[in-house]
Amino acid sequence: SDWSSDVCSSDLTIIAHVDHGKTTMIDNLMKQSGSFRENEVVDERLMDSGELEKERGITILAKPASINWQDSRVNIIDTPGHRDFAAEVERVLSMADGALLLIDSAEGVMPQTKFVLAKALKQGLKPIVVINKLDKADQRANEVLDETFDLFVSLDANEEQLDFPVLYASGRSGWASKEVDGPRENLHPLLDLIIEHVQPAELDKTKPFAMLSTLLYADSFLGRNLVG
């Protein structure tokens, strides 16, 4: 197969506390980027595949999904957000080119967020910050942004990491904006920012094909599948 395609491909990990809207955001990013056919039936919470994950609404095993936008491909990795799955977190971060930090506009930064973010910063990733659930009545987006900056400082983020881009969003309603009171139309501003901010790793296309494996799973129709 033509793996030497000129399409730019980058790997993005999404960091979020439980119930901060990560899986719903991924659902709408995929829908708005045109990842599905018009007549395709799409379940909610696409990235929650295991029974326990669907029941509790948490991510235990990292799972990838790809979206195409502006002649680029972004491989989104739904990353565990709990320190109990530290090995899985480190495995994912080691293969990521960038990170998206998703924070609830009312709850703000949580301990589990700090745990994963610390590892991402140590890995040298430069996160995009998205203040999510801005449609909440008790949202306090400006305070949460200040808390987030303080968290970056406390984790010894470098100057580039401290100069993080910020968007305000509602994953459930499917919009993102550069301002708290900005247009609430769609997630295109977030998709554009991901393409602009996350730089793909440099590849030597003269070398033989090599792939970092992300997931091995069984399918009743296709059999064993390896994704990377």
Language-model segment annotations:
Residues 153-228:
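Conserved catalytic-core segments of large NTP-driven translation/proteostasis enzymes
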Residues 99-161:
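Conserved C-terminal guanine-recognition region of P-loop GTPase G domains, centered on the G4
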Residues 26-30, 88-89, 111-114, 138-143, ...:
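Short acidic, glycine/serine/threonine-rich loops at helix termini
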Residues 24, 28, 91, 115, ...:
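Alpha-helical scaffold segments in soluble metabolic enzymes
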Residues 82-83, 134, 172-176:
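A short, flexible beta-alpha/helix-coil linker loop
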Residues 5-103, 107-109, 116, 147, ...:
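P-loop NTPase switch module centered on the Walker A-proximal segment
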Residues 51-56, 60, 65-66, 116, ...:
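N-terminal, positively charged nucleic-acid-binding surface of large information/translation enzymes
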